[in-house]
From Swiss-Prot:
Region forming the signal peptide: 1-16
One GO term describing the cellular component: extracellular region
Keyword flag rRNA processing: no
Annotated protein name in UniProt: Uncharacterized protein Rv2599
Compartments reported by the entry: Membrane
Transmembrane portions of the chain: 114-134
Superkingdom: Bacteria
Record keywords: Membrane, Signal, Transmembrane, Transmembrane helix
Membrane topology: Single-pass membrane protein
Pfam families reported for this sequence: DUF4247
């Protein structure tokens, strides 16, 4: 192989490596909160979180969100779907007159330091049995 051809191969490999690196970083840094903000219309915002309007059933919308980014935990209770991500709790369900609302709450808003006892069934482990009142959090000890 000639010297110029080797430079061309090396350059091509460098470009391919850079594209792979950027693609990998992009895929690893998916953020469900940003996805929701860019795909759904914001209905309201308060100190505890942001609400977005959605169409379809809560289960369908939650499944769409799970396809974008897999949550650490998923549970449902009646018509509401709960998705726990590394930094957010996402709740999808009816709210007031709205048949489908997505609520995004940052974990630092209170979940991390025990401000909320019940996050819907299926979120385990529950709070310690020696905690307030001596009973595990949530029904069946799930938190």
């Amino acid at each position: 192989m000639s010297r110029n051809r080797l430079f061309l191969v090396a350059g091509s490999l460098a470009v391919a490596a850079a594209v792979s690196l950027i693609s990998g970083i992009t895929l690893l840094n998916r953020d469900v909160g940003s996805y929701i903000a860019s795909h759904y219309r914001q209905e309201s915002r308060d100190v505890n979180g942001t609400r977005y309007l959605c169409t379809g059933s809560p289960k369908q919308v939650a499944t769409t969100l799970v396809k974008y980014q897999t949550p650490a935990a998923r549970a449902s209770h009646t018509d509401t779907e709960y998705l726990r991500y590394r930094n957010n709790i996402v709740t999808v369900g009816p709210d007031g007159t709205y048949p489908c609302i997505i609520r995004v709450e940052n974990l630092s808003a209170g979940y991390n330091h025990g401000a909320y006892v019940f996050l819907g069934p299926g979120f385990t482990p529950g709070s310690p049995s020696g905690g307030s009142g001596g009973s595990p959090g949530g029904p069946g000890g799930s938190k």
